[in-house]
């Protein structure tokens, strides 16, 4: 699994999307009501690094 560190440009919220690839990531974001044009992908991390940061995960 990949952990995409994302930022919502409207709220400034940082969060992870845990998924297998970019297509699945976008599907998860849309299913959770996010506008893809308002989301920046900051980094892609492994599970261990993502757990250390502790942001919410979708």
Which residue ranges define each predicted feature?
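Short, mixed-charge low-complexity intrinsically disordered segments
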Residues: 30-58
């Amino acid at each position: 699994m990949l952990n995409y560190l994302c930022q919502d440009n409207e709220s400034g919220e940082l969060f992870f999307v845990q998924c297998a690839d970019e297509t699945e990531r976008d599907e998860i974001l849309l299913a959770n009501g996010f506008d893809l044009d308002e989301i920046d992908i900051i980094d892609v991390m492994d599970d261990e690094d993502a757990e250390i940061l502790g942001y919410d995960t979708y």
